[in-house]
Swiss-Prot record:
Mg(2+) binds at residues 46, 126, 129. This is Ribonuclease 3. It comes from the Bacteria. The gene is rnc. Homodimer. GO terms for molecular function: double-stranded RNA binding; metal ion binding; ribonuclease III activity; rRNA binding. It comes from Ureaplasma parvum serovar 3 (strain ATCC 700970).
């Protein structure tokens, strides 16, 4: 790792490290640790970061207000649960790691360097949580909140994540009001970081999703399918 670039990265995120080694630990995969005979990897910090993310996001959601019938109100328990679940999904945390630029500093074993499978997406999720754990240990929970404001909370405010039911559930409920035919998510392309999924219902392709993970592609396919289903019901 280029320590100067990493220090610049921390500075861009308003972090003046008291203990640089804890951040390096947060970015060290066990394969790299094994190859270089290091005693530490990111797993313990990932455990801590997971708890920190949950607390900060739960606190944000608890205080979040929405406009409902011209009045502002808090989210109810079900909405809070869905919002938190949507905000900490694996693909969201993985995306946040890439968006923040953490993946540029990941230290990983030689055997995994060329791996473009879903396993890497899981590793990106892990280092995001581990980095949050490192920030919590070195800087405190307020700085963690600032990092999450730039990522997960920003995605929520911009509408990329919502507190309502996920797209797959919405499509399933709407489709089953019409008939009970099965909904299938077919993986039709699996090329490195490009997964293409077709949502098939009523013997028709209702939605297509392309993303870096199959799960995310299924969600996009369901989102597109909802629009097509709306047209179907309007014409019916």
């Amino acid at each position: 790792m280029d320590n100067k670039k990493f220090l610049d990265f921390l500075k861009q995120n308003r972090i003046e490290p008291k203990n640089l080694s804890i951040y390096l630990e947060a970015l060290t995969h066990k394969s790299y640790a094994n190859e270089h005979k290091l005693t530490k990897n990111y797993q313990r910090l990932e455990f801590l970061g997971d708890a920190c993310v949950e607390w900060v996001i739960s606190n944000f959601i608890f205080n979040y207000k929405i406009k409902d019938n011209e009045k502002m109100r808090s989210l109810d328990e079900g909405e809070m649960t869905r919002a938190r679940s949507n905000m900490v999904r694996s693909e969201i945390l993985s995306y946040a790691a890439k968006d923040l630029g953490l993946t540029d500093f990941l230290m990983i074993g030689v055997g995994l360097e060329q791996d473009q499978s879903a396993r890497m997406e899981k590793i990106y999720e892990d280092i995001f949580e581990a980095f949050i754990g490192a920030v919590a240990q070195d800087q405190g929970i307020k700085k963690v909140s600032l990092i999450l404001e730039k990522t997960l909370i920003k995605y929520f405010r911009e509408g990329q994540i919502n507190y309502q039911k996920d797209y797959k559930t919405i499509f399933q409920e709407q489709a089953q009001r019409i008939n009970k035919k099965p909904i299938m998510y077919k993986l039709v392309r699996n090329e490195g970081d490009k997964k293409e999924v077709h949502l098939v219902w009523n013997d028709l392709i209702y939605g297509i999703g392309i993303a870096s993970t199959r799960k995310e592609a299924e969600i996009l396919a369901a989102k597109n399918a909802i629009l097509k289903l709306d047209d179907y019901t309007k014409k019916a």
